[in-house]
UniProtKB/Swiss-Prot annotation:
Species per Swiss-Prot/TrEMBL record: Dictyostelium discoideum
Protein name: Ribosomal RNA processing protein 36 homolog
PANTHER family assigned: RIBOSOMAL RNA PROCESSING PROTEIN 36 HOMOLOG
Kinase is among the record's keywords: no
Residue ranges of the region described as Disordered: 1-131, 279-298
Coiled coil: 88-112, 196-228
Main localization of the protein described in the UniProt heading: nucleus
Pfam families: RRP36
Amino acid sequence: MKPDIIKKRRPLPSDDEDEYNEEDEMYEDDNNNYEEDEDDDDDDDEDDEDDDENEEELIKQQLSNVSFSSLLKYKKNGPTDKLNLNTITKNLQQQKSFKKEEQQEKEEMNSKNKYKIKRESSDAPVEMTAMKPVSRFRQVVVNKTKMNVRDPRFDSLSGGKYNEDLYRKRYGFLDDVIKRDVERMESTWKQMDDCRERDQLYKKIQSKKSQLKTQQLKDQKRETKNKLWSNEIESVKKGKTPYHISNKTVKQFELQEKFKQLKASNKLDKFMETKRKRISSKEKTFLPQRRSFDQDEN
Protein backbone atom coordinates (compact mmCIF):
# COMPACT_ATOMS: atom_id res chain seq x y z
CA MET A 1 0.00 0.00 0.00
CA LYS A 2 1.22 3.51 -0.84
CA PRO A 3 1.51 5.97 2.11
CA ASP A 4 -1.12 8.70 2.33
CA ILE A 5 0.39 12.10 1.68
CA ILE A 6 -0.53 14.76 4.25
CA LYS A 7 -1.00 18.15 2.61
CA LYS A 8 -1.92 20.23 5.69
CA ARG A 9 0.59 22.69 7.06
CA ARG A 10 1.58 22.44 10.69
CA PRO A 11 1.43 25.59 12.82
CA LEU A 12 4.93 26.76 13.60
CA PRO A 13 6.36 29.69 15.46
CA SER A 14 6.99 32.89 13.61
CA ASP A 15 10.75 32.64 13.96
CA ASP A 16 10.88 29.44 12.07
CA GLU A 17 8.47 30.55 9.30
CA ASP A 18 11.14 31.10 6.70
CA GLU A 19 12.66 27.73 7.31
CA TYR A 20 9.26 26.13 7.04
CA ASN A 21 8.51 27.76 3.70
CA GLU A 22 11.65 26.29 2.20
CA GLU A 23 10.96 22.87 3.64
CA ASP A 24 7.34 23.01 2.50
CA GLU A 25 8.31 23.84 -1.06
CA MET A 26 10.69 20.92 -1.12
CA TYR A 27 8.00 18.66 0.28
CA GLU A 28 5.45 19.77 -2.36
CA ASP A 29 7.95 19.18 -5.18
CA ASP A 30 8.59 15.68 -3.90
CA ASN A 31 4.87 15.06 -3.70
CA ASN A 32 4.31 16.17 -7.32
CA ASN A 33 7.16 14.00 -8.54
CA TYR A 34 5.72 11.04 -6.66
CA GLU A 35 2.30 11.54 -8.31
CA GLU A 36 3.90 11.68 -11.76
CA ASP A 37 5.79 8.45 -11.04
CA GLU A 38 2.55 6.83 -9.93
CA ASP A 39 0.83 7.77 -13.23
CA ASP A 40 3.76 6.34 -15.20
CA ASP A 41 3.55 3.11 -13.23
CA ASP A 42 -0.17 2.80 -14.03
CA ASP A 43 0.54 3.23 -17.77
CA ASP A 44 3.27 0.58 -17.61
CA ASP A 45 0.90 -1.82 -15.87
CA GLU A 46 -1.71 -1.35 -18.62
CA ASP A 47 0.91 -2.01 -21.33
CA ASP A 48 2.04 -5.14 -19.50
CA GLU A 49 -1.56 -6.39 -19.33
CA ASP A 50 -2.01 -5.87 -23.11
CA ASP A 51 1.23 -7.75 -23.79
CA ASP A 52 0.07 -10.61 -21.57
CA GLU A 53 -3.24 -10.83 -23.45
CA ASN A 54 -1.45 -10.93 -26.81
CA GLU A 55 0.86 -13.64 -25.51
CA GLU A 56 -2.13 -15.68 -24.31
CA GLU A 57 -3.78 -15.40 -27.73
CA LEU A 58 -0.57 -16.54 -29.42
CA ILE A 59 -0.29 -19.47 -27.02
CA LYS A 60 -3.90 -20.47 -27.73
CA GLN A 61 -3.30 -20.39 -31.48
CA GLN A 62 -0.19 -22.53 -31.07
CA LEU A 63 -2.02 -24.94 -28.79
CA SER A 64 -4.74 -25.42 -31.42
CA ASN A 65 -2.10 -26.85 -33.82
CA VAL A 66 -0.54 -29.11 -31.16
CA SER A 67 -1.95 -32.63 -30.72
CA PHE A 68 -3.59 -33.64 -27.45
CA SER A 69 -1.15 -36.48 -26.74
CA SER A 70 1.90 -34.20 -27.00
CA LEU A 71 0.26 -31.67 -24.65
CA LEU A 72 -0.29 -34.40 -22.07
CA LYS A 73 3.36 -35.42 -22.32
CA TYR A 74 4.56 -31.85 -21.77
CA LYS A 75 2.08 -31.38 -18.92
CA LYS A 76 3.58 -34.38 -17.12
CA ASN A 77 7.15 -33.23 -17.72
CA GLY A 78 6.69 -29.60 -16.62
CA PRO A 79 4.78 -26.33 -17.05
CA THR A 80 3.88 -25.14 -20.55
CA ASP A 81 5.89 -21.97 -21.03
CA LYS A 82 6.03 -19.87 -24.14
CA LEU A 83 9.38 -21.33 -25.15
CA ASN A 84 8.15 -24.90 -24.70
CA LEU A 85 5.10 -24.26 -26.88
CA ASN A 86 7.21 -22.68 -29.60
CA THR A 87 9.53 -25.67 -29.60
CA ILE A 88 6.55 -28.05 -29.72
CA THR A 89 5.01 -26.34 -32.73
CA LYS A 90 8.34 -26.15 -34.53
CA ASN A 91 9.01 -29.83 -33.91
CA LEU A 92 5.55 -30.79 -35.12
CA GLN A 93 5.89 -28.71 -38.27
CA GLN A 94 9.29 -30.28 -38.96
CA GLN A 95 7.86 -33.78 -38.42
CA LYS A 96 4.99 -33.08 -40.83
CA SER A 97 7.36 -31.73 -43.46
CA PHE A 98 9.68 -34.76 -43.04
CA LYS A 99 6.72 -37.14 -43.37
CA LYS A 100 5.54 -35.44 -46.55
CA GLU A 101 9.03 -35.60 -48.04
CA GLU A 102 9.34 -39.30 -47.12
CA GLN A 103 5.96 -40.09 -48.73
CA GLN A 104 6.94 -38.26 -51.91
CA GLU A 105 10.28 -40.11 -52.03
CA LYS A 106 8.53 -43.46 -51.50
CA GLU A 107 6.03 -42.73 -54.29
CA GLU A 108 8.85 -41.76 -56.64
CA MET A 109 10.81 -44.91 -55.78
CA ASN A 110 7.72 -47.09 -56.27
CA SER A 111 7.00 -45.48 -59.64
CA LYS A 112 10.61 -46.04 -60.71
CA ASN A 113 10.88 -49.61 -59.41
CA LYS A 114 7.48 -50.57 -60.79
CA TYR A 115 8.76 -51.27 -64.27
CA LYS A 116 12.28 -52.46 -63.32
CA ILE A 117 12.94 -56.17 -63.84
CA LYS A 118 15.78 -57.83 -61.93
CA ARG A 119 17.58 -60.55 -63.85
CA GLU A 120 20.98 -62.18 -63.86
CA SER A 121 20.86 -62.46 -67.65
CA SER A 122 18.41 -61.76 -70.47
CA ASP A 123 17.36 -65.43 -70.66
CA ALA A 124 16.90 -65.87 -66.88
CA PRO A 125 13.43 -65.78 -65.30
CA VAL A 126 12.14 -62.64 -63.61
CA GLU A 127 12.85 -62.31 -59.87
CA MET A 128 9.73 -61.29 -57.95
CA THR A 129 8.99 -60.86 -54.26
CA ALA A 130 7.11 -63.61 -52.43
CA MET A 131 5.18 -61.01 -50.40
CA LYS A 132 2.98 -59.97 -53.33
CA PRO A 133 0.42 -62.37 -54.84
CA VAL A 134 1.49 -63.53 -58.29
CA SER A 135 -1.05 -63.39 -61.11
CA ARG A 136 -1.81 -66.51 -63.12
CA PHE A 137 -1.14 -64.92 -66.49
CA ARG A 138 2.44 -63.69 -66.51
CA GLN A 139 5.38 -63.89 -68.88
CA VAL A 140 8.28 -65.56 -67.07
CA VAL A 141 10.78 -65.42 -69.93
CA VAL A 142 10.44 -62.70 -72.55
CA ASN A 143 10.74 -63.96 -76.11
CA LYS A 144 13.41 -62.12 -78.06
CA THR A 145 11.85 -62.80 -81.45
CA LYS A 146 8.11 -62.21 -81.47
CA MET A 147 6.19 -64.36 -83.95
CA ASN A 148 3.77 -62.33 -86.00
CA VAL A 149 0.97 -64.61 -87.18
CA ARG A 150 -0.56 -63.54 -90.47
CA ASP A 151 -3.96 -64.59 -91.77
CA PRO A 152 -3.92 -64.31 -95.57
CA ARG A 153 -7.67 -63.73 -95.71
CA PHE A 154 -7.49 -60.47 -93.73
CA ASP A 155 -3.92 -59.38 -94.33
CA SER A 156 -3.23 -56.09 -96.12
CA LEU A 157 -0.59 -57.79 -98.31
CA SER A 158 -3.20 -60.07 -99.85
CA GLY A 159 -5.60 -57.25 -100.73
CA GLY A 160 -7.26 -56.67 -97.36
CA LYS A 161 -10.60 -58.22 -98.35
CA TYR A 162 -11.15 -61.95 -98.53
CA ASN A 163 -10.89 -63.24 -102.09
CA GLU A 164 -12.02 -66.88 -102.14
CA ASP A 165 -10.78 -67.61 -105.66
CA LEU A 166 -7.30 -66.37 -104.88
CA TYR A 167 -7.24 -68.20 -101.55
CA ARG A 168 -8.23 -71.52 -103.14
CA LYS A 169 -5.60 -71.11 -105.84
CA ARG A 170 -2.84 -70.53 -103.31
CA TYR A 171 -3.94 -72.98 -100.59
CA GLY A 172 -5.78 -75.64 -102.57
CA PHE A 173 -2.99 -78.13 -101.83
CA LEU A 174 -4.30 -78.41 -98.24
CA ASP A 175 -7.12 -80.68 -99.48
CA ASP A 176 -4.51 -83.20 -100.66
CA VAL A 177 -2.82 -83.02 -97.24
CA ILE A 178 -6.16 -83.76 -95.50
CA LYS A 179 -6.79 -86.70 -97.85
CA ARG A 180 -3.40 -88.20 -97.00
CA ASP A 181 -4.15 -87.75 -93.28
CA VAL A 182 -7.49 -89.56 -93.70
CA GLU A 183 -5.81 -92.50 -95.48
CA ARG A 184 -3.17 -92.76 -92.73
CA MET A 185 -5.82 -92.60 -89.99
CA GLU A 186 -7.91 -95.29 -91.71
CA SER A 187 -4.91 -97.63 -91.89
CA THR A 188 -4.19 -97.15 -88.15
CA TRP A 189 -7.91 -97.56 -87.34
CA LYS A 190 -7.94 -101.02 -88.95
CA GLN A 191 -4.98 -102.16 -86.84
CA MET A 192 -6.33 -100.87 -83.46
CA ASP A 193 -7.85 -103.25 -80.87
CA ASP A 194 -9.18 -100.93 -78.17
CA CYS A 195 -12.84 -100.10 -78.84
CA ARG A 196 -12.78 -96.68 -77.21
CA GLU A 197 -9.73 -95.51 -79.15
CA ARG A 198 -11.23 -96.92 -82.35
CA ASP A 199 -14.42 -94.90 -81.82
CA GLN A 200 -12.49 -91.71 -81.16
CA LEU A 201 -10.37 -92.16 -84.27
CA TYR A 202 -13.42 -93.03 -86.35
CA LYS A 203 -15.08 -89.75 -85.32
CA LYS A 204 -11.98 -87.83 -86.37
CA ILE A 205 -11.96 -89.58 -89.76
CA GLN A 206 -15.63 -88.76 -90.35
CA SER A 207 -15.12 -85.10 -89.42
CA LYS A 208 -12.21 -84.82 -91.88
CA LYS A 209 -14.28 -86.43 -94.64
CA SER A 210 -17.22 -84.10 -94.02
CA GLN A 211 -14.79 -81.17 -94.13
CA LEU A 212 -13.58 -82.26 -97.56
CA LYS A 213 -17.13 -82.78 -98.81
CA THR A 214 -18.30 -79.32 -97.71
CA GLN A 215 -15.25 -77.77 -99.35
CA GLN A 216 -16.05 -79.57 -102.63
CA LEU A 217 -19.64 -78.27 -102.54
CA LYS A 218 -18.36 -74.73 -101.94
CA ASP A 219 -15.99 -75.05 -104.88
CA GLN A 220 -18.81 -76.27 -107.13
CA LYS A 221 -21.05 -73.34 -106.13
CA ARG A 222 -18.27 -70.89 -106.79
CA GLU A 223 -17.57 -72.42 -110.21
CA THR A 224 -21.26 -72.25 -111.21
CA LYS A 225 -21.44 -68.59 -110.14
CA ASN A 226 -18.31 -67.78 -112.11
CA LYS A 227 -19.77 -69.50 -115.19
CA LEU A 228 -23.02 -67.56 -114.91
CA TRP A 229 -21.17 -64.28 -114.49
CA SER A 230 -18.93 -64.97 -117.47
CA ASN A 231 -22.00 -65.84 -119.63
CA GLU A 232 -23.76 -62.66 -118.49
CA ILE A 233 -20.74 -60.49 -119.31
CA GLU A 234 -20.52 -61.99 -122.82
CA SER A 235 -24.25 -61.40 -123.40
CA VAL A 236 -23.92 -57.75 -122.28
CA LYS A 237 -20.99 -57.31 -124.67
CA LYS A 238 -23.16 -58.63 -127.51
CA GLY A 239 -25.77 -55.96 -126.77
CA LYS A 240 -28.29 -57.70 -124.49
CA THR A 241 -29.73 -55.98 -121.43
CA PRO A 242 -27.90 -56.81 -118.18
CA TYR A 243 -29.64 -59.30 -115.92
CA HIS A 244 -29.16 -59.64 -112.16
CA ILE A 245 -28.23 -63.21 -111.18
CA SER A 246 -30.31 -64.21 -108.14
CA ASN A 247 -29.79 -67.16 -105.79
CA LYS A 248 -32.74 -68.96 -107.42
CA THR A 249 -31.08 -68.97 -110.84
CA VAL A 250 -27.83 -70.18 -109.23
CA LYS A 251 -29.68 -73.12 -107.60
CA GLN A 252 -31.37 -74.07 -110.88
CA PHE A 253 -28.05 -74.00 -112.69
CA GLU A 254 -26.51 -76.17 -109.93
CA LEU A 255 -29.30 -78.76 -110.32
CA GLN A 256 -28.71 -78.92 -114.07
CA GLU A 257 -24.99 -79.46 -113.53
CA LYS A 258 -25.73 -82.14 -110.93
CA PHE A 259 -28.07 -84.04 -113.26
CA LYS A 260 -25.44 -83.93 -115.98
CA GLN A 261 -22.84 -85.44 -113.64
CA LEU A 262 -25.26 -88.17 -112.45
CA LYS A 263 -26.18 -89.05 -116.03
CA ALA A 264 -22.52 -89.35 -116.95
CA SER A 265 -21.88 -91.70 -113.98
CA ASN A 266 -25.14 -93.74 -114.52
CA LYS A 267 -26.48 -92.82 -111.07
CA LEU A 268 -29.43 -90.73 -112.17
CA ASP A 269 -32.09 -93.47 -111.80
CA LYS A 270 -31.02 -94.33 -108.29
CA PHE A 271 -31.00 -90.68 -107.31
CA MET A 272 -34.51 -90.14 -108.71
CA GLU A 273 -35.89 -93.18 -106.81
CA THR A 274 -34.54 -91.99 -103.49
CA LYS A 275 -35.94 -88.54 -104.16
CA ARG A 276 -39.37 -89.97 -105.03
CA LYS A 277 -39.47 -92.01 -101.82
CA ARG A 278 -38.56 -88.97 -99.77
CA ILE A 279 -41.33 -86.87 -101.33
CA SER A 280 -43.93 -89.64 -100.94
CA SER A 281 -43.07 -90.11 -97.24
CA LYS A 282 -43.69 -86.42 -96.72
CA GLU A 283 -46.99 -86.45 -98.63
CA LYS A 284 -48.43 -89.55 -96.90
CA THR A 285 -51.42 -89.01 -94.62
CA PHE A 286 -51.38 -91.33 -91.62
CA LEU A 287 -54.68 -93.00 -90.63
CA PRO A 288 -55.87 -92.38 -87.05
CA GLN A 289 -55.42 -95.26 -84.58
CA ARG A 290 -58.89 -94.75 -83.05
CA ARG A 291 -62.21 -94.35 -84.81
CA SER A 292 -64.33 -91.28 -84.41
CA PHE A 293 -67.20 -91.17 -81.87
CA ASP A 294 -69.97 -90.93 -84.49
CA GLN A 295 -68.86 -94.13 -86.26
CA ASP A 296 -68.87 -96.10 -82.96
CA GLU A 297 -72.51 -95.16 -82.29
CA ASN A 298 -73.58 -96.36 -85.75
